[in-house]
């Protein structure tokens, strides 16, 4: 198991994540797991839900450092120039929304298919949500989940990537250093601090 009790957000071994009782494991059983990040959420009290985590996460993205927002803008400009993000008629048929069971739909607290930032929501349960993104480079999935700990909660951000052509792996390899060294660590620090500020715990450095 990953050791990081005194650290802020850190990457987690996939095996540690897979033992968590999440719907995403079965739902995405045939989709490669790219990486997993743990987010330490100190405080918060009982009864917090994934919607609370999502709200702080969105605020963390919006408050990301200039280098991170600059990288995001650069990716969007390149995507617009090369047509990566232009929606194609056939992509709807590839959406994993068609995998949702009647139970998934009944238990989701938000309607499948609604926008979730630049992604599309598949389901949102009390402690877990899953969204997808289909563009010209990847068919990606973002799993956000949480579990209680003695001092608050531990959230997991897991990224799954289904290749859409041979370019997908090259693309993911090219952006991996930026994602893993700059983007995710910076956003996760903002999320952890934002959670501490919102719920009255100032121990996050």
Protein language model features and the residues they cover:
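Active-site-proximal cofactor/substrate-binding loop regions of enzyme domains
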Residues: 204
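A conserved amphipathic terminal alpha-helix motif
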Residues: 172-201
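Intrinsic-disorder/low-complexity, polar/charged segments enriched in Ser/Thr/Lys/Arg/Asp/Glu/Gln
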Residues: 34-38, 128, 154-156
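Short hydrophobic helices that act as membrane-entry/anchoring signals
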Residues: 69-80, 168-176, 180-183
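Hydrophobic-ligand binding "helix-grip"
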Residues: 106-149
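Beta-strand/loop substructures that line and gate deep hydrophobic ligand-binding cavities in soluble
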Residues: 135-173
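Hydrophobic side chains in beta-strands
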Residues: 39-41, 133, 159
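Hydrophobic ligand-binding cavity/cleft-lining segments
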Residues: 2-107
């Amino acid at each position: 198991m990953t050791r990081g009790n005194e650290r802020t957000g850190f990457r987690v071994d996939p095996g540690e994540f897979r033992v968590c009782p999440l719907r995403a494991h079965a739902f995405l059983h045939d989709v490669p797991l790219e990486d997993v990040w743990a987010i330490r959420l100190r405080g918060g009290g009982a009864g917090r839900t994934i919607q609370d985590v999502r709200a702080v996460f969105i605020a963390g993205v919006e408050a990301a450092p200039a280098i991170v927002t600059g990288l995001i803008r650069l990716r969007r400009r390149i995507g617009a120039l090369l047509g990566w993000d232009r929606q194609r008629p056939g992509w709807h048929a590839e959406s994993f929304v068609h995998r949702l069971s009647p139970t998934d739909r009944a238990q989701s607290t938000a309607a499948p298919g609604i926008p979730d930032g630049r992604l599309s929501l598949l389901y949102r349960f009390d402690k877990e949500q899953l969204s997808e993104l289909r563009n010209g480079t990847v068919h990606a999935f973002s799993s956000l989940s949480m579990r209680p700990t003695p001092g608050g909660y531990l959230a997991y951000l897991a990224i799954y990537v289904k290749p859409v052509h041979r370019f997908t792996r090259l693309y993911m390899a090219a952006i991996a250093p930026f994602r893993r060294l700059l983007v995710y660590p910076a956003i996760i620090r903002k999320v952890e601090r934002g959670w501490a500020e919102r719920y009255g715990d100032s121990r996050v450095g």
